[in-house]
Regions:
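A general alpha-helix detector
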Residues: 244-248, 299-304, 315-318
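Bacterial N-terminal signal peptides that target proteins for export
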Residues: 1-8
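Long, low-complexity segments enriched in small/aliphatic residues
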Residues: 321, 325-363
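Bacterial N-terminal signal peptides
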Residues: 8-15
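Structural motif
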Residues: 284-302, 309-311, 339-346
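Gly/Pro-rich cap/lid or specificity-loop segments adjacent to the active site
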Residues: 21-294, 350-425, 429-486
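Sec/Tat signal peptide C-region and signal peptidase I cleavage site
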Residues: 16-20
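Short helix-capping/linker segments at secondary-structure and domain boundaries
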Residues: 306-321, 358-363, 394
Length: 486
């Protein structure tokens, strides 16, 4: 056994599947003082629900799903509201400690609010963390093939630990099983129905739950929609985001005169790196020693794709402006950090690989990649990494349109390249009782909930069964980083 595996065994003994003799459906609740990241405390309950790891296996392990329940402040509370984090791999409990804590508290006027840790995440057991640290070779020009091989090598270590040593059935970690977890949670809570409050991958899970258990869902909020066939991103959506961003940059009074054609600037920098990669010396934060890092087109494409549609987008003009002047220090430092980060979550890889893509979408991505600036880098390291994880594909029926009478509130941002407005509009067709809030200028994640108090107002109206009075909301304009001319 390698030293890495020995160490993981010691650190993660508490993350094992629940003993087989414990009964499926067992719910444990205890009083819990919840504390957020600011030190604010609120009385709550900590819950743990035992469910099968793989429902189709009569000899399945039991696993434990963790959640925190914030009791309703209403005298006549409605169905519980279950928060579904994104990722996949995000923690609902962890999310509640952060910037969305006031929103968790506000929704209590509707019903109990449950911060839920999906199977394999957060406080749920096992938490399928992969602690293998990447070691991308620095003396070789970075490429998709080189990076995938390093990721696959580390994936093998994580798979060996969880599957072979801890006897976890990784094939049980898919969105269908997670949807059935929510049905089991509803039953354990004694609720006739639950409402779902979701974002990003959480909407992928919410849609699957509404397909599998439509009668169990009272209402659903989907922010940043990722439909059943949206796991793989379309290059055309990413390109449209860059075009929208370029228009904002051109109109910006601070930087527009220096960057009148952002797409042209991006292309010129990519072409330069394609023809002549740059070697940059930066300090390794771990060793405090200077190392040489190769920055080429792949590196810069990946950095952009990894951050596109987030608040980091505001740094893109300065990044490319400096690069056009020959300064590649920032991308070199970022790539060094990426090349030494931990692998991530086995749950995340298994979920995305199982959800997969239809042949139609795969062909569309391949076709569009040839005509767009970032090509198909937004999906890296998928689908190649799935060859290592070997997650059973959920099939095209899973990826087909969802049709249900559940009332749904979609929330989208015009600058969200990860889960664009078109995703929500595509799936709204299956929900005749739906509303769509569009936030002008909002990127992915927090801004979909927090960029305006009107968003919370709309959510509360929707959960009360009232018409949503404002469906067009303006977020604060993006503040671009200064160009730092020399």
């Amino acid at each position: 056994m390698s030293k890495t595996i020995q160490l993981l065994t010691c650190l993660l003994l508490l993350a094992l599947p629940i003993a087989a003799q414990q009964k499926s459906g067992t719910l444990k609740l205890k009083p819990y003082t919840f504390e957020n990241s600011k030190g604010e405390k609120v009385d709550s309950e900590f819950g743990a629900l035992s469910v099968p790891e793989k429902r189709g296996d009569p000899n399945s392990n039991l696993i434990e799903l963790a959640f925190v329940r914030f009791k309703s402040t209403s005298k006549n509370p409605g169905p519980p509201i279950v928060y579904l984090a994104g990722g996949p791999g995000g923690s609902g409990i962890g999310t509640a400690t952060g910037s969305r804590f006031p929103l968790f508290m506000a929704l209590r006027e509707i019903g109990d609010v449950i911060a839920f840790d999906q199977r394999g995440t957060g406080y749920s057991k096992p938490n399928l963390g992969c602690y293998e640290q990447l070691k991308m070779p620095l003396d070789v020009a970075p490429s998709r093939a080189v990076a995938v091989e390093e990721l696959r090598k580390n994936a093998r270590g994580c798979i060996e630990y969880w599957r072979d040593i801890q006897r976890v059935d990784l094939t049980g970690y898919n969105t269908n099983e997670s949807a059935d977890d929510l049905e089991d949670l509803r039953k354990a809570l004694g609720a006739k129905q639950i409402s779902l409050w979701s974002i990003s991958y959480g909407t992928h899970l919410a849609l699957t739950t509404m397909r599998r258990h439509p009668q169990s869902i009272h209402r659903a909020i989907l922010a940043g929609t990722e439909g059943p066939d949206h796991t793989y991103k379309l290059p055309s959506n990413v390109q449209k985001h860059l075009e929208d961003l370029a228009a904002l940059i051109k109109a910006d009074p601070e930087i527009g005169k220096d960057i009148p054609d952002f797409l042209g600037l991006m292309k010129s920098v990519f072409d330069r790196l394609d023809a002549q990669p740059q070697t940059v010396e930066v300090m390794d934060p771990r060793t405090k020693q200077n190392v040489k890092v190769i920055v080429n087109k792949f590196v810069l494409q990946y950095i952009v794709a990894n951050n596109i549609g987030t608040t980091v987008t505001a740094n893109f003009p300065a990044l490319f402006y400096r690069a056009s002047k020959g300064d590649f220090t920032n991308p070199a430092q970022v790539w060094l950090n990426i090349s030494r980060q931990e692998l991530g979550s086995a749950m995340s890889y298994m979920m995305d690989c199982a959800s997969g893509q239809t042949a139609v979408r795969r062909e569309q991505i391949a076709r569009e990649a040839k005509e767009t600036l970032l090509e198909d880098i937004s999906n890296f390291p998928f689908p190649e990494i799935c060859e290592e994880w070997k997650a059973p594909d959920l099939g095209d029926q899973f990826r087909s349109p969802v049709i249900a009478n559940v009332p749904v509130l979609f929330i989208s941002g015009t600058l969200d390249a990860r889960t664009p407005i078109s995703n929500a509009e595509e799936y709204r067709k299956g929900f005749p009782n739906s509303t769509h809030i569009i936030i002008e200028g909002a990127v992915h994640s927090d801004p979909l909930f927090l960029s305006s108090p009107k968003i919370k107002d709309g959510m509360l109206e929707f959960l009360k069964g009232q018409p949503v009075t404002v469906t067009k909301i303006a977020a604060p304009p993006m503040k671009f980083a200064p160009l730092e001319k020399k």
